[in-house]
Amino acid sequence: MKPANEIELSEVIRGANGPLRIVGGGTRAIGPLNAGEVLETGALSGISLYEPGALTIVAGAGTPLSEVEAELAKGGQRLPFEVPDLRGLLGRDGASTIGGVVSANAAGPRRIQAGACRDSLIGVRFVDGVGTIVKNGGRVMKNVTGYDLVKLLAGARGTLGVLTEVAFKVLPRPEVEATLTLDGLDPTAAVTAMAQALGSPFEVTGAAYLDGQVCLRIEGMAGSVAYRSAALVKLLGAGWDVADAAHSAKLWSEIRDMTPFVGKPGAVWRISVKPSDMPQVLATLNEAQTLCDWGGGLIWARVPDVNDAQAVTLRACLAALGGHATLVRASDSVYATTPAFHPEPAGLAALSASLRAKFDPRGILNPVGMG
């Protein structure tokens, strides 16, 4: 099913007799695909408003991300949160949609400075599980529902409603960027260096650690970037190299899109943890290739795709640390016994169930979309 507009979508959901699997570009699904009839949002497409002076863009949920980014580039602007393209990692085709970005609350390396997708999202329209059309945020800021639906819909993976339109605040594109790199650091030294850089006044917009190398990005006007890069090197000590804009852009696109893992076998974990706990988590993993982003707060790990892909050991470690792990890629045999999404604590699970009962009382929208 591919409804042509919001009214048709409402009618489809209202008349549904079973589960619906919501598909945008089909590029960000995690774990086994949901059962149910496919409901495509691709026809809910198009940029309805772009006001560069107001730093605002509004688009249909089915609008290709590339179309949104191209329009913003014409105005010298961009989405603040640096959307990852994980098609290579996940082995997916298709074109990512802006609604899919919101549903996954996708965010790349710049999250440490600009926030996640939900932090730039200012308005949504969606159809809930009984076919009601709902609008929240944007130009109508009064919240009459008692819920901050803008924040709730970001990251809900379609379990609370089918997005039809999204509105974002956007930011100017920086003039240049540069990246400081230092090789030969162990995880503890890497976390210390990244924390020192992120705690400085020099506005670091990327802090990653891979293959023993720490990478720190600075963006802005040319003069400012040159000054801040030099000042950061002075703060951190000798030995740092400074990559120019072209090399910096290539490096961070590879970090953002997980290029080091593309084409390599294995299960892949996406782990969220306090940056200071990064070394302990890395020590827990066996035979793992890792890439750490967000100053150590996000760990990507490629491990052997056998048994439970180290789920029991990893999640036990994270339970003690207050972190969580999502199995974003694995074989069917691993997924058969290992939930893709981290088990929720009892209180959070009850809250999630209550929200789903409110917005989708029949439980038909992406019924296993969150594990």
Predicted regions span which residues?
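Conserved glycine-rich FAD pyrophosphate-binding loop
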Residues: 32-35, 239-371
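C-terminal substrate-binding/cap subdomain adjacent to the FAD-binding core in PCMH-type
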Residues: 103, 122-265
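Residue-level signal for inorganic ion chemistry
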Residues: 62, 216, 301
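Glycine-rich beta-strand-to-loop/alpha-helix junction loops that act as flexible
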Residues: 21-28
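Short secondary-structure junctions
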Residues: 17, 198-203, 285-287
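N-terminal glycine-rich flavin-associated loop
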Residues: 1-20, 41-92, 102, 106-139, ...
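Short acidic-glycine loop/turn motifs at beta-strand connectors
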Residues: 34, 52-53, 128-130, 210-212, ...
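Short, conserved charged micro-motifs
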Residues: 66-68, 187-192, 223-230, 277-285, ...
